[in-house]
Amino acid sequence: MHHESPIRRRKTRQIHVGKVAIGGDAPISVQSMTNTETRDIAATVAQIRRLEAVGADIVRISVPSMDAAEAFKTIRAQVETPLVADIHFDHRIALQVMEDGVDGLRINPGNIGSLDKTRLVVEMAKDKGIPIRIGVNAGSLEKDIQEKYGEPTPEALVESALRHVSILDELNFHDVKISVKASDIFLAVSAYRLLSEKVDYPLHLGITEAGGLRSGTVKSAIGLGLLLRDGIGDTIRVSLAADPVEEIRVGFDILKSLHLRQKGINLIACPSCSRQEFDVITTINALEARLEDILEPMDVSVIGCVVNGIGEAKEADIGLAGGDKRSILYYRGKQVDRVENNDIVDVLEKRIRAEIAERQATRHEG
């Protein structure tokens, strides 16, 4: 049940954040940001490792001080994922983290001091092959732009972004990606669409300050979905007032839904009704908890009855259609067994892990 996406992605320049390619024909990357105190090295490393475990491509860390920059050096040595340092105002912090192995910078060249200070940062970034993300936010536009437009508008966000781009252009630096984030979906979507018409740099998508787990997921799915459907976007972050791990999970769910990237188990499940032959909701919750460590793409269908269950099961890699006391198990489109309803979770987990092991063995032999 693996579908090619009908979406034709916008062609952009390609950059690299560490080992991760962004733009061009590279897969859309999913990233998050730590919410620990960066100087708390143990907590920050632990959180990054949790993000790594669920498939984060890139992790951003706020580095607001030289003390935090010192901590960053130790953090960098203890994790594998490419790290982006989020820096404001003090160019010395940018210089320090570049010496200590940062993979990318999130700065706005216009707010880290004089042109000479900006030049120092840009020259080192160029020398070390470190890309810069220009991050414009509707809540922190420059004073003159606020006065010009009166309020955040798509044109205001794009003008701010292009102002920062022009500084890097003047310094002959083009290893750049850009974001123009807002908490309002319509503002953010319009700004990204306008920006995409003016530059060929890769774009980092996000609906900033989207809200808690439920409301933030909905806002991000709508906003990012609209842009991704237009072929706009090379890397995404789902901003949630929640565990950053959820940002990665939701991000991949958005990409899976649009057939833009497959990672992990794609669970297809009915919402359940009185026809269900087993407790679908409890079963799905248990499966999600047991299978969250799996990054291998696989479609698994779990439907509570045979009305839609058989058709869905035949389309999935592994599928189950509910039956009276015993449900029907399908593997690669064919019925292979009947499963006691009390054993569904155990049997499906075993089948899924066996299928993954077989795939990995086949790839290794190849």
From Swiss-Prot:
InterPro entries reported in the protein's UniProt record: Dihydropteroate_synth-like_sf, Enolase-like_C_sf, IspG_bac, IspG_bac-typ, NO2/SO3_Rdtase_4Fe4S_sf
GO BP term, example: terpenoid biosynthetic process
Catalytic activity line of the entry: (2E)-4-hydroxy-3-methylbut-2-enyl diphosphate + oxidized [flavodoxin] + H2O + 2 H(+) = 2-C-methyl-D-erythritol 2,4-cyclic diphosphate + reduced [flavodoxin]
Pathway: Isoprenoid biosynthesis; isopentenyl diphosphate biosynthesis via DXP pathway; isopentenyl diphosphate from 1-deoxy-D-xylulose 5-phosphate: step 5/6
EC numbers, comma separated: 1.17.7.3
GO molecular function, one term: 4-hydroxy-3-methylbut-2-enyl-diphosphate synthase activity (flavodoxin)
The protein's required cofactors: [4Fe-4S] cluster
Top-level enzyme category: oxidoreductase
One of the Pfam families matching this protein, by short name: GcpE
Cofactor note: Binds 1 [4Fe-4S] cluster.
Binding-site residues, [4Fe-4S] cluster: C270, C273, C305, E312
Keywords linked to the UniProt accession: 4Fe-4S, Iron, Iron-sulfur, Isoprene biosynthesis, Metal-binding, Oxidoreductase
Protein family membership: Belongs to the IspG family.
Function: Converts 2C-methyl-D-erythritol 2,4-cyclodiphosphate (ME-2,4cPP) into 1-hydroxy-2-methyl-2-(E)-butenyl 4-diphosphate.
Protein name: 4-hydroxy-3-methylbut-2-en-1-yl diphosphate synthase (flavodoxin)
Organism: Acidithiobacillus ferrooxidans (strain ATCC 23270 / DSM 14882 / CIP 104768 / NCIMB 8455)
Gene (UniProt): ispG
